[in-house]
């Protein structure tokens, strides 16, 4: 019998650590020894469909894509496993920040402004279309046909950042603990 093979997006990703923690809830040895592979998020559903992998841990919209086209079923979200941990971080070196203070400030302010605008946006039609235009969302999901999934993804976008976009020290501690535990 072929061993189970699961995929995540990167060995140092939140998805890798959430997958390991979820498996460890069942059996630590299984979590330690199961075959994990790395795949870019847009290829997860295709790899599952072609039986290259047996399951995956990835963020939206790819997990919903698999479910909508009938290839997979979401059994847990990373937020179910590790709530409120920083998922995405844009980091620059201290040297770069010192050499480019205006660019660094402008970049930070642009991200914060975009996060706030997304949080309070009433209509996500334009955002949704932009995500489709850039092939981030590669499947049809409408607010009239796939009501629950559409609003689930919209809610993830809206709450991508809480009150502060700053990573918290607890997030770094958790990530370092995971690196020591699983790498």
Each language-model region and where it sits:
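Secondary-structure end/capping motifs
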Residues: 101-183
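Ligand-binding "clamshell"
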Residues: 65-79
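Bilobed "Venus flytrap"/periplasmic-binding protein-like clamshell domains
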Residues: 2-68, 173
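Short coil/turn segments
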Residues: 9-14, 79-81, 94-97
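A structural motif
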Residues: 83-85, 150-151
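Inter-helical turn/loop segments and adjacent helix faces that build the functional surface
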Residues: 29-34, 98-104
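A bilobed periplasmic-binding-protein/Venus flytrap-type ligand-binding module shared by bacterial periplasmic
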Residues: 85-103
């Amino acid at each position: 019998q072929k061993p189970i093979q699961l995929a995540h997006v990167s060995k140092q990703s939140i998805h890798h650590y959430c997958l390991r923690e979820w498996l460890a809830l069942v059996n630590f040895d299984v979590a330690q020894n199961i075959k994990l592979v790395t795949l870019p998020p847009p290829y997860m559903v295709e790899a599952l469909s072609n039986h290259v992998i047996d399951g995956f841990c990835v963020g939206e919209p790819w997990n919903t894509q698999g479910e909508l086209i009938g290839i997979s079923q979401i059994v847990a979200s990373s937020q179910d496993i590790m709530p409120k941990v920083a998922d995405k971080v844009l980091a620059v070196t201290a040297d770069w920040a010192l050499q480019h203070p205006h660019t660094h400030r402008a970049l930070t302010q642009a991200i914060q402004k975009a996060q706030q605008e997304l949080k309070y946006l009433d209509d996500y039609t334009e955002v949704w279309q932009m995500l489709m235009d850039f092939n981030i969302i590669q499947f049809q999901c409408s607010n009239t046909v796939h009501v629950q999934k559409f609003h689930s993804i919209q809610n993830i976008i809206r709450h991508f950042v809480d009150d502060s976009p700053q990573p918290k020290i607890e997030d770094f501690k958790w990530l370092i603990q995971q690196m020591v535990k699983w790498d």
